[in-house]
A protein has these predicted regions:
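Non-globular, low-confidence helical/coil segments that flank catalytic cores
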Residues: 4-148
């Protein structure tokens, strides 16, 4: 049985309030933690951009997609893979099917499992740019600095 994702949110607003589902107001940072039983995903929305960190197990992928849609996501500027284990990457194939993804940030940890190889094929088929995360790397996510 799939559980609908529960969500806790941290929002830093420059004015106004979120007022429920949909994209965050202009000029705000929204960080949503997507809890789907084992593992978490994190959605970061800022400056009109959306980034997803981890997408949990394969069977939870549809719940992640539903959650992203409920937050007004129609494309992802980037996804981040914190490690290549199935409980961090399994749901990304559903995400690739549902949304265009511009950049995929991978940890660079070696892995040759079927799940990881399937994920890499999905990245290739998506046509996304791939970047390997490294210590001290700085990224601009919609005007918000993300660093490793």
């Amino acid at each position: 049985m799939l559980l609908a994702p529960a969500c806790a949110e941290l929002e830093l607003l420059t004015g106004g309030s979120r007022g429920g589902p949909g994209p965050p107001p202009s000029g705000s940072l929204s960080v949503s933690f997507i809890d789907v039983s084992q593992g978490d995903g994190v959605l970061v929305q800022a400056g009109g951009e959306s980034y997803l960190i981890d997408a949990v197990r394969p069977e939870e992928g549809p719940s992640v997609v539903d959650f992203l849609r409920s937050r007004g996501v129609d494309s992802l500027d980037g996804i981040v893979v914190s490690n290549p284990d199935a409980d961090h990457i399994g749901g990304f194939l559903d995400v690739f099917d549902a949304f265009p993804v511009e950049t995929v940030f991978v940890s660079g940890d070696p892995n040759s499992t079927l799940t990881y190889n399937t994920f890499l094929r999905g990245v290739r088929d998506e046509g996304a740019t791939t970047e390997v995360l490294r210590a001290g790397m700085l990224m601009d996510w919609g005007g918000v600095r993300a660093d490793t």
